[in-house]
Amino acid sequence: MTSPRARRGEIWLADLDPVRGNEQAGIRPVLVISATRVGVGPGGLAIVVPLTGTARTNDGAVAIPAGEGGLRRDSYALPVKLRSIARERLLARWGMARQETVDAVADRVRALVGIEPPRR
């Protein structure tokens, strides 16, 4: 079976189980933030930020409205839960997030790891 090829900015349904500790669990949408070339080749990975439908305001979550990228309800990207996953965990492509959303999530990730955001 061929693993799906995820592209930066796509929203996918993914199986994040099994998890440890406070990692985001379950089958849920994720936003791919890795450069598309990262997932190329056998054994490729995708760097993703899990999404939740629970309103979050105190941990750097980024709001994404229903309809964007195929989301069925208002959602929140959780940059603090960033992780690399095997492409085999990707179950179904839902759509593409707006560039502004991808940029906002990427900026939060940069802040988490201490990298200055690019000047726009």
Predicted regions and their residues:
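Conserved functional hotspots at enzyme active or ligand-binding sites that engage polyanionic ligands
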Residues: 1-120
